[in-house]
Each structure stands twice: as structure tokens, then as C-alpha cells.
Amino acid sequence: MEQQEKKKRKIQRSISTQSSSMSSIPLDVTSKILAKLPAKSVLRARCVSKQWSSISTDPYFISNMFPKQSSSSLLIFFKPKRKLFVISIHQNPNEPQHVGICPRLDLFPNSKKTHYLEPYLEKILNLAQTQKQLEGNTIGDNDGQCINGVLYYRASLDQSNVDIIMSFDVSTMYNKDITLWVLEDAKWLCKHFTRASYNDQPLQALSGINGITDDGEFIYVAYVLDSFYILYYDPEKKSYRRVDLQGVGDADFMLRNGLGNMDGIRIHTCLNIESLLSL
């Protein structure tokens, strides 16, 4: 008992000494130290002390000391033979049009459990999506809210007193030319976007819009795992760049993972945002 008490007091003194040494460091010095760490290390450092957690969660610290830490990546999923493969590709607007890369690929065996992509990031969630078709003309107009490229707005049907919520998904509706009126500097500007094409073929024939980069580029990924590449289309400049993914879906890939024919394997994508901002 006496030895346990001595050991307990020794541990308490050690913790007290470490806490006092950390508290003696000025806040500005601590902020500069944390700012030199990568985002993952800063998130882990929040568990060190309340002071470090308070500094690393402060919006001023995140916006000023970590202006370039928030980054987006494109997650690509495909599931042949009950195996889930996930590819994470960081969005880099400075890449040339044709690049051969070997992206990181994670294999999740058949399991009903939820898998984490990163220890500190969000889980893979399956969000149910419902679609309803409404007949008749809508009347009136109202303010809308855009969430992840989907515009939600309130409307009502003829001879009905019930309000409904409509949605307009740009990623699925962008099959024809679109005219947008944008308010900039207290002036309405008309912007006309024509349907994009690649090698004289509409991009929609290759795939739908899978997301938008931070620079406003539309992301196109093929529906099936064939000639695996990603197209980034800039609607302002009407130009595109292509990123080829090598080492995915070829003969070596299939042999290495014990897979057969990859024809017809559908691809699913979503954007992932890494940021220090707390939810």
C-alpha cells in the first residue's frame, strides 16, 4: 500500500510539473508552435491541455495561422466482389492536363461496421435520397438555400394550400445550357454556361458532375472503371484538364487483389473537406 501511495504521489507531482511548465509558455509562443504543426498533430494536441484546445479551436487562430490547412479531396469508391475500395485524390489546380499518378487506395473487407477514413475525420455515411415528381405549374417565388450544389426552395401547387420544398440538383440537371444571373457589386450580371464537351463528346455522356473544386472547376469521373481518368472543366475559361489514374483497374491491380473482370463496376464519388474548424 505504501509503495502504491508513493507511486501515485510521484505521478501527481510529475503531472503538476508538466502543467506548470506548459502554463509558463506565453500564449503567442504556444500559438506559433501549434501553427508549425500539421493539421493532424494540432487536432491531437487538443487533448494535451485545455489551453491548447482553446487555442487550436479559436476561429482567429484557424483563419490566420492556418490559412492553407483546409483542403478538399475527391473520394472515389468502387466495390467489386464484396470488397470496398476507396481512393483519396487531393485537388490540385496546378497539375498539368495529363498526369499519371498512383493514388492511395484503402481496402475494406466485407463488414457491416462503419469504417473511418481518417482517425479525426468524419465517417462514411449512406444518406438516403428521395425524389418526387410534381405535376402542374408552381406559383410564386421565394428565397432558396444552396447546399452542396443542390438548390432548395419553397413553392406551392395550383389549387393547393400546402407549401412544398423543391430541389434542383445542378449535378444532374446540367445537361443543357444554363443562364445564371449573379449579383456582384450591387449589379446583376448575366452568365451563360454552355454544355461542355471533351473530344467532341458531351461530358455528361462520360459521367455526371461529381463535384466542384475550390477554384470553381466541375469534376467529371467515369461511371464505370474503364480508362480511369478524371476531367476538370472550367466553365469560365471553357477549358479542361485531365488526370489519369494509373495502377487502378488494370491487370496487375486485378491480380494483386484477387479480382476478375472489372467491366461494369460502377464508381461512386464524393468530396471530402479537411479543416480545423469544429462542427
UniProtKB/Swiss-Prot annotation:
Under the heading Gene3D superfamilies, the entry gives:
1.20.1280.50
In this chain the F-box domain maps to 19-69
Coiled-coil spans are none
Q: What SUPFAM superfamilies does its record include?
A: F-box domain (SSF81383)
InterPro entries, alphabetized: F-box-assoc_dom_typ3 (IPR013187), F-box-like_dom_sf (IPR036047), F-box_dom (IPR001810)
Q: What is this protein called?
A: Putative F-box protein At1g50880
The record, for CDD domains, names:
F-box_AtFBW1-like (cd22157)
